[in-house]
């Protein structure tokens, strides 16, 4: 594991059916980083939410950014935290 624990949190609208997008992002993180992150947390929510945090950084918010994030956006945020 990385010396610096990196936590990824995905808050998604369960009632909206956002599970496929959630699993796509989570799968990309797991496949790319595996043991380099300390946890991936999936939080079912409501109100159209789809937010992704890497550590304390909000890297995507559906309300702010619109739509779903590209997996590469999330992976780049993790790379940046690993490099810092």
Please provide the spans of the model-predicted regions.
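A generic structural motif
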Residues: 33-39
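Short beta-strand
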Residues: 41-45
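Non-catalytic, surface beta->alpha helical segment in thiol-disulfide oxidoreductase systems
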Residues: 59-84
